Amino acid sequence: MSDNLSLHGTTILCLKKNEEIIIAADGQVSHGNTVLKSTARKLRTIANNKIIAGFAGSTADGLALFEKLAVKIEQHKHNLLRSAVELAKDWRSDKYLRRLEAMMIVADRSHILILTGNGDVVEPENNVAAIGSGGLFALSAARALMSYENNLTAEEIALKSMNIAADLCVFSNHNIIMEKVV
């Protein structure tokens, strides 16, 4: 394996239930099989918490993409979908951006989007999205809880799902940060 294990070493989960949208992230930063930090903040807000982004992959690359997305959001008057598509166009055509190794989940009141390193913009089904090495664990847990636990809030589902992912993924931890889209 390459030194680039940090590309997959995290868990980011976003879900919508009953008009409540939550994005959650673990706090672990790994390089190979070494934990470099356990309290990293992988979520960022834009437009007074109306848009929230979480990133997986290289921290520097994730922050660079977040900055570019923030500029697009301002240019397009907080239209998340248009901003994401414009960022994806840049990501595909710019030689520098094409080398960035990161993925993002971005959400506002209307959309949950996954932005991939290939310049794709994906709006997932079932109001749940997850990325990173623990993403499939968190996604599976969230979908199951949303289907069978009607009494849980979006925040409770996110926390339970992230804890399951942290139990199973060695590149994720239980230091979970959550943000709510307002």
Swiss-Prot record:
Gene3D superfamilies: Glutamine Phosphoribosylpyrophosphate, subunit 1, domain 1. The keyword Hydrolase applies. GO terms for biological process: proteolysis involved in protein catabolic process. The keyword Hydrolase applies. GO terms for cellular component: HslUV protease complex; proteasome core complex. One of its GO terms (molecular function) is threonine-type endopeptidase activity. A double ring-shaped homohexamer of HslV is capped on each side by a ring-shaped HslU homohexamer. The assembly of the HslU/HslV complex is dependent on binding of ATP. Belongs to the peptidase T1B family. HslV subfamily. Protease subunit of a proteasome-like degradation complex believed to be a general protein degrading machinery. This is ATP-dependent protease subunit HslV.
